[in-house]
Amino acid sequence: MKLLKRLVSVFAIVLAVGSNAFAGDEVRIVIDEGVDGARPIAVVPFVGSAPEDISKIVADDLRNSGKFNPIAVSQMPQRPTSAAEVNPEAWSNIGIDAIVIGQVVPSGNGYSITYQLIDTVGASGTPGTVLMQNSYTVTNKWLRYGAHTVSDEVFEKLTAIRGAFRTRIAYVVQKNGGSQPYEVRVADYDGYNQFIVNRSAQPIMSPAWSPDGQRLAYVSFENKKSQLVVQDLNSGARKVVASFQGHNGAPAFSPDGSRLAFASSRDGVLNIYVMGANGGTPTQLTSGAGNNTEPAWSPDGNSILFTSDRSGSPQVYRMDASGGSATAVGGRGSAQISADGKTLVMINGNNNVVKQDLTTGVSEVLSTSFLGESPSLSPNGIMIIYSSTQGLGKVLQLVSADGRFKASLPGSDGQVKFPAWSPYLTK
């Protein structure tokens, strides 16, 4: 199967934003806490040479999920290049029940990536059985995407959970100086292949993805007032969809992409509104005392979570998507529900990222970073990205949903904040 056509169709949004520029200073993952309790796995160095280290990218992806703990190359009992060369007992003796082997070789104007996932303990029947294999042809530009594809397939085969390593993150960078220091950027989930969506002399806040991954909504102050902008990532076209009196902020697309929930103080008090994704007359959903902000849709689109200080201090509430009475959920703010509707992620009163099982009500603290903000879930619910304060600046943090793996994605050219994880971008 060839990736090239699929890559061009899926990621044309990156190439077609004519007014955008690629940013030189990318955010990159720096490990803060490892995954000692995760399932050990081996990703054997791929045979061949390419501008990107395919096996390392695959190993890093699996590690970042918190589900796997790839062993170091120095710990590998052998380095097979084919399934026939695998000695299952050598691997099972050190506690490895699955290994990934592969090759990367020049092919035309790009490279051919081939891999095999091998069972070393006979869980599938016989030790040495090939659980999955595939081959892709990619251009140099898409080598990392090809590696992430391997990761997605291996991850799904071993966990029965769809991989999310070919997704992207949007975030805001406040650069250290310059005439337009505020930028909305998009990058691969691990910080590579970063590009600038928009830059401004005035603050930019709260990017939010449309469910098809083709648009970003965000808050812009470029006209000396807060307004909501929706930008098409394919054409670069921007449209101001809300510029009401007072503050307009915290946009959130509905699951079907047809509506936009947001917060506005157009009537003097900050309340939650919903309007069409292209603008129009908004419908007010909240009322009464207190400020209401940070709306987030449930996966089925039937309810909305939001943050309100109506009880005297900020707390997360849940209401019907058409408005009406609201029920307190807990936490302090920035709530988001996983795509399966089972888990709630939010910020608690100590500014830590917590997850709450919506069936049992049990909560678990995932981060103890200073002043955690804006948590955003990967579309499979396995990883969470958020911003925190380090020193005098803001950085992005990555944590697996089980809390095993923690990493930082510091920016080298400014403060990084307001992360938003994309939906699945493959077809």
From Swiss-Prot:
Changing residue 326 to V: In strain: 1479. One of its GO terms (cellular component) is periplasmic space. It is found in: Periplasm. Gene3D superfamilies: TolB, C-terminal domain, TolB, N-terminal domain. InterPro entries: 6-blade_b-propeller_TolB-like (IPR011042), PD40 (IPR011659), Tol-Pal_TolB (IPR014167), TolB_N (IPR007195). Changing residue 160 to G: In strain: 1479. It holds the Pfam family TolB_N. It comes from the Bacteria. Residues 1-23 form the signal peptide. Keywords: Cell cycle, Cell division, Periplasm, Signal. Transmembrane segments: none annotated. Changing residue 322 to N: In strain: 1479. Changing residue 14 to I: In strain: 1479. One of its GO terms (biological process) is protein import. The keyword Cell membrane does not apply. Its main location: periplasm. Part of the Tol-Pal system, which plays a role in outer membrane invagination during cell division and is important for maintaining outer membrane integrity. Belongs to the TolB family. The Tol-Pal system is composed of five core proteins: the inner membrane proteins TolA, TolQ and TolR, the periplasmic protein TolB and the outer membrane protein Pal. They form a network linking the inner and outer membranes and the peptidoglycan layer. This is Tol-Pal system protein TolB. It comes from Haemophilus influenzae (strain ATCC 51907 / DSM 11121 / KW20 / Rd).
